[in-house]
Regions:
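Catalytic machinery of carbohydrate-active enzymes
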Residues: 1-328
Length: 328
């Protein structure tokens, strides 16, 4: 029997970034079956990894300051680690007893900056075969989601279209009426998911903004998950869906980590860095470039909606193409 191989992984604080690097943990688990994991994240990123197989401990450290690193060192210094993976790029691994380490380094200034999945893969020299984002969900989490979904069960239930209309900034929010048109096309009588259901994901605060979307189909075809499922439960729910359409948001990253076809609607954010990953991940944007947005909103933080010029027809066509291309 192979000896236990303890791995310490310091995850990114930003949950979206932690999701984009999550495939590294899956690769480690699959290639080192005897590995056990201690994961370090922030309040926002750590809960996404609570169902990681062979998880010894899940620690929360908010900042990257020396004081925070000392607190973390004091909690993990007694262990001799087989591998330390530091996705925040700190100097902590130099203070620990370990056989190997992989530490994020600044991307070379003379090289074009690639997608964040590739950036994360480079930490472990996997940039030629970057592992796709993936979040593990346990049988317990799956059972919780099944219980939630049972509230909406009815005979002849069809495939589920997930819509994520929220985002963490109004500048990235495509209008709900436009999402409603996308959902109506896919789920309507002549659509490819005419027998399907509509799942709306997001925070409780997003519920009001989704009114037009939920009115797209009959009430009994709508599954309301906003504010009812936490983020990892939402990922488990998304694993049960046929496809997803949403803004650049945590929900779009969760859909990518669920392994389903994903269409992201982008405006003042860069899909070449953070767009849905993989052959079944696609992005649509309007005519403006990132430089165009920054001329009007230099720090990309003003209370301005930048998404009005993303045309409905372009998103509808992309959604129909994604559905057709991923049809079994």
């Amino acid at each position: 029997m192979a000896a236990r191989f303890p791995i310490l992984c310091i995850l990114e604080s930003r949950p979206e970034d932690a999701i984009m690097s999550s495939g590294l943990l899956r690769r480690l688990h699959e290639e080192i079956p005897q590995a056990s994991f201690t994961l370090v994240g922030s309040d926002a990123s750590a809960p996404l990894f609570r169902d990681m197989p062979n998880l010894d401990d899940l620690l929360v450290i908010e900042g990257d300051g020396r004081g925070e690193r000392f607190k973390l060192w004091n909690r993990v210094r007694a262990q001799k680690w087989g591998l330390v993976v530091d996705l925040r790029g700190t100097d902590l691994s130099g203070w620990l007893s370990r056989r190997k380490r992989a530490v994020r380094q600044p991307w070379p200034k003379d090289q074009p900056v690639p997608h964040k999945v590739i950036q994360a893969a480079r930490v472990m020299q996997l940039e030629d075969d970057p592992p796709a984002p993936w979040l593990y969900t346990s049988p317990e989490t799956d059972a919780e989601v099944d219980e939630f979904l049972a509230e909406y069960a009815k005979p002849g239930d069809g495939p589920i279209l997930a819509i994520g209309p929220g985002s963490n900034w109004i500048g990235k929010v495509w209008q709900e009426e436009r999402f409603a048109k996308v959902a109506g096309t896919l789920l309507g009588p002549d659509g490819p998911m005419s027998d399907g259901r509509l799942l709306i994901v997001g925070e409780e605060a997003d519920r009001e903004a989704a009114h037009a979307i939920r009115m797209t189909v009959a009430r009994e075809r709508v599954i309301e998950a906003q504010g009812r499922l936490d983020r990892l439960q939402t990922c488990a729910m998304l694993k049960r869906c046929r496809m997803y359409v949403g803004n650049d948001s945590i929900w779009t990253h969760l859909a990518t980590a669920a392994g389903i076809p994903v269409l992201g609607v982008f405006g003042p954010s860069d899909e070449t860095l953070e767009g849905p990953w993989g052959p079944n991940g696609r992005a649509v944007r309007g005519p403006k470039s990132m430089d165009d947005f920054r001329r009007h909103d230099p720090r990309l933080d003003q209370t301005i909606n930048h998404m009005y010029d993303v045309p409905v027809d372009k998103v509808v066509d992309a959604a129909l193409a994604l559905h057709a291309d991923t049809e079994a």
